[in-house]
Swiss-Prot record:
GO terms for molecular function: mRNA binding; structural constituent of ribosome. Homodimer. Part of the ribosomal stalk of the 50S ribosomal subunit. Forms a multimeric L10(L12)X complex, where L10 forms an elongated spine to which 2 to 4 L12 dimers bind in a sequential fashion. Binds GTP-bound translation factors. GO terms for cellular component: cytosolic large ribosomal subunit. Belongs to the bacterial ribosomal protein bL12 family. This is Large ribosomal subunit protein bL12. Keywords: Ribonucleoprotein, Ribosomal protein. The gene is rplL.
Length: 127
């Protein structure tokens, strides 16, 4: 029984990222090639003219406190809960606004943090 291309594609599609990375390294070693595309080939392969570049969806976000608003104490409490900082450190972050509260947060984490901070009266920006 021979294996079809569809079966190979299905098998590779079910691999985890780590398994796929190891698989690619093994193929590179076995065939003496590199999976990285040369820069010149990438420039030639780029679509020309009116084709708009596809934007990748951002997966990591920075949570930035723009201002504490009127309820500074409530905002400090939320900052402490979100960041795990002590009272003094959280107060310094709030007093030093605009300041980055968290970097490389997931989309869900960033949205939840923004919701909590806005409810406490803060002005927040997600980048």
């Amino acid at each position: 029984m021979s294996i079809t291309k569809e079966q190979v594609v299905e098998f590779i599609g079910n691999m985890t990222v780590l398994e796929l990375s190891e698989f690619i390294k093994e193929l590179e070693e076995k065939f003496g090639v590199s999976a990285a595309a040369p820069m010149a080939a990438m420039a030639v392969a780029a679509p020309a003219g009116d084709a708009a570049p596809a934007e990748e969806e951002k997966t990591e976000f920075d949570i930035i406190l723009k201002s504490a608003g009127a309820n500074k104490i409530g905002v400090i409490k939320v900052v402490r809960a979100l960041t795990g900082l002590g009272l003094k450190e959280a107060k310094d972050k709030v007093d030093g606004a605009p300041s980055t509260l968290k970097e490389a947060a997931s989309k869900e984490e960033a949205e939840e943090a923004k919701k909590q901070l806005v409810e406490a009266g803060a002005e927040v920006e997600i980048k």
